[in-house]
């Protein structure tokens, strides 16, 4: 494998990839997954993205992108509504792993459910706080999705997506009742679906 600013693990048996997602619960926006193969030696300070400040996440994201092999996958709002959020999450995870450009020896996934993959995989509850490769994936997934929602907020400022990232906060729900759903909303999610029945 190619060497850049980090030294890639070249032994197939060591190609253990971490996968995590961001955005299963929001009412708006895609679900995003990231897959990360850490460079040899790892990156100091990795942790569950939810436990890190925005500034720290940003610094770690830069290090991960520069020093690790990584892939990002998304499943759109349309895919979420068509196949459900769990299957859309698995689809995003699959796309993230495929974006790596190689077949890993094993994939460690945060959570208790796994996609149907041809390669070996393990679901690990709380894995984003236990395994650095999953921690790195959680950081990339959150940072990537946050940027998507901040960009979408420019077209729909009333919903406050630049701060709530599509989650059902009081501001978001009030704007949803006032303005109705946007193309970014998940119509299969109850708060949005109920408005469409009124």
From Swiss-Prot:
Question: Which family is this sequence assigned to?
Answer: Belongs to the RNase HII family.
Traced from the root, the source organism's taxonomic lineage reads: Bacteria, Pseudomonadati, Pseudomonadota, Alphaproteobacteria, Sphingomonadales
Q: Which InterPro entries does the record associate with it?
A: RNase_HII, RNase_HII/HIII, RNase_HII/HIII_dom, RNaseH-like_sf, RNaseH_sf
SUPFAM superfamilies the record matches: Ribonuclease H-like
Q: Where in the cell is it found?
A: Cytoplasm
Report the PROSITE patterns cross-referenced here. Answer: RNASE_H_2
Q: What class of enzyme is it?
A: hydrolase
The protein's annotated catalytic reaction(s) are: Endonucleolytic cleavage to 5'-phosphomonoester
- The domain of life is Bacteria
Q: Could you state a single Gene Ontology molecular function term?
A: RNA-DNA hybrid ribonuclease activity
Which coenzymes or cofactors are required?
Mn(2+); Mg(2+)
Q: Would you tell me the protein name for this molecule?
A: Ribonuclease HII
Q: Which UniProt keywords apply?
A: Cytoplasm, Endonuclease, Hydrolase, Manganese, Metal-binding, Nuclease
Got a GO cellular component term for this one? Answer: ribonuclease H2 complex
Gene Ontology BP terms: DNA replication, removal of RNA primer; mismatch repair
Q: What is its EC number?
A: 3.1.26.4
Instruction: Give every RNase H type-2 domain span.
Output: 14-198
Q: Which organism is it from?
A: Sphingopyxis alaskensis (strain DSM 13593 / LMG 18877 / RB2256)
Its biological function?
Answer: Endonuclease that specifically degrades the RNA of RNA-DNA hybrids.
Which of this chain's residues are annotated to bind a divalent metal cation? 20-21, 110
* Cofactor remark: Manganese or magnesium. Binds 1 divalent metal ion per monomer in the absence of substrate. May bind a second metal ion after substrate binding.
């Amino acid at each position: 494998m190619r060497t850049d600013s980090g030294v890639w693990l070249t032994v197939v048996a060591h190609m253990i990839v971490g996968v995590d997602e961001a955005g299963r619960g929001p009412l708006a926006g895609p679900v995003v997954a990231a897959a990360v193969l850490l460079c040899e030696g790892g990156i100091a300070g990795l942790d569950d993205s939810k436990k890190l400040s925005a500034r720290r996440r940003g610094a770690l994201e830069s290090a991960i992108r520069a020093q690790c092999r990584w892939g990002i996958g998304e499943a759109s709002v349309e895919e979420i509504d068509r196949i459900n959020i769990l299957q859309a999450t698995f689809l995003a995870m699959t796309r993230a792993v495929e974006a790596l450009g190689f077949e890993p020896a094993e994939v460690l996934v945060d959570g208790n459910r796994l996609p149907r993959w041809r390669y070996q995989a393990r679901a690990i509850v709380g894995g984003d706080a236990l395994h650095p490769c999953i921690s790195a994936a959680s950081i990339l997934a959150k940072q990537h999705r946050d940027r998507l929602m901040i960009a979408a907020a420019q077209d729909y400022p009333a919903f406050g997506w630049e701060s709530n990232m599509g989650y059902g906060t009081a501001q978001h729900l009030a704007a949803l009742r006032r303005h109705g759903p946007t193309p970014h909303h998940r119509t299969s999610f109850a708060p949005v679906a109920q408005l469409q029945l009124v």
